[in-house]
Regions:
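Bacterial N-terminal signal peptides that target proteins for export
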Residues: 1-13
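Accessible peptide chain termini
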Residues: 1-3, 17, 167
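Bacterial N-terminal signal peptides
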Residues: 10-22
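Sec/Tat signal peptide C-region and signal peptidase I cleavage site
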Residues: 23-29
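Flexible, solvent-exposed loop/hinge segments and secondary-structure transition points
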Residues: 30-264
Length: 264
């Protein structure tokens, strides 16, 4: 007996959608500034839980996400052996951090997500920024959870969007231009920034042309005042561990002399 064409239509539609996802994912991977294997290796070597150094926070496993210059997700990975080795919610946060750093950086000026904290706080000059690009939340839980963090992660090829204004997102630069961005999440935001800094350096995509920190890059700036404002306007609060110490050691952060007593 022949199957009615009408009955086949939903199946054919589903196959077409799956095929389009595969094509999008393949195209995104081809245009990615990093390869999945490179990103995974760099992440594992930058996180204590997977054999790397401490970053001053909880030393949890981490997620890392890279977007292309147009904001499409092209790589998602993790430092643990399975998705539940990391905070599951941090997969989306990492993607949103990457989106933010890419969207707000330029060829000549980098802004890390850490640089946005003070400005986006109530009363700040960027207050309301987090509402400007809501994430496509239906994408976060789509696909097979067992593939999260793999080369075939369902987020690859998608534009999730989202804006995050705390540490962990960095723009990626080759020797000529901005080529995308990296987001890391799974620990304190201060530790996430340190991990992202290490990963970007390991990938060779840290040719930052300029930025708002005193070191003229996108380093995290620990200059929050007692009234919770930032001396520079681009500051980020400390997170309670030794993250600021680590940041200074790896040149990922700037702490004014008056604030250094606060991390002793």
């Amino acid at each position: 007996m022949r199957t009615p064409v009408r009955a086949l239509s939903p199946l054919l539609a589903a196959v077409a959608v799956l095929a389009s996802w595969a094509v999008c994912g393949t195209a995104a991977a081809q245009n990615c500034p990093v390869q999945y294997e490179q990103l995974t290796k760099a992440l594992k070597e930058s996180v204590k839980a997977s054999g790397g150094p401490s970053n001053g926070g909880f030393d949890n496993n981490e997620w890392a996400v890279v977007v292309t210059r147009d904001g499409g997700i092209c790589a998602v990975t993790m430092s643990g052996g399975k998705p539940t080795d990391q905070w599951l919610g941090s997969r989306a946060i990492a993607a949103e951090k990457a989106n933010t750093a890419n969207a707000l950086s330029l060829d000549k000026t980098a802004l890390s997500t850490a640089n946005l904290y003070a400005g986006a706080a109530p009363g700040g000059y960027l207050f309301g920024l987090v509402t400007t690009d809501p994430p496509a939340t239906t994408l976060i839980s789509a696909g097979d959870p067992k593939t999260y963090g793999s080369a075939s992660d369902p987020l690859v090829g998608k534009h999730l969007g989202g804006v995050v204004v705390f540490g962990g997102g960095l723009a990626l630069y080759n020797q000529q231009e901005l080529v995308g961005a990296l987001g890391v999440s799974g620990d304190t935001s201060c530790a996430d920034h340190n991990v992202a800094w290490r990963v970007r350096h390991a990938l060779g995509l840290d040719h930052v042309p300029g930025g708002v920190s005193p070191d003229h890059n996108d380093a995290i700036i620990y200059d929050m005042l007692p009234d919770k404002t930032s001396a520079s306007g681009y500051g980020h609060p400390q997170c309670g561990g030794s993250e600021a110490d680590v940041a200074m050691q790896i040149h990922a952060g700037f702490v004014p002399k008056w604030a250094q007593v606060m991390i002793k």
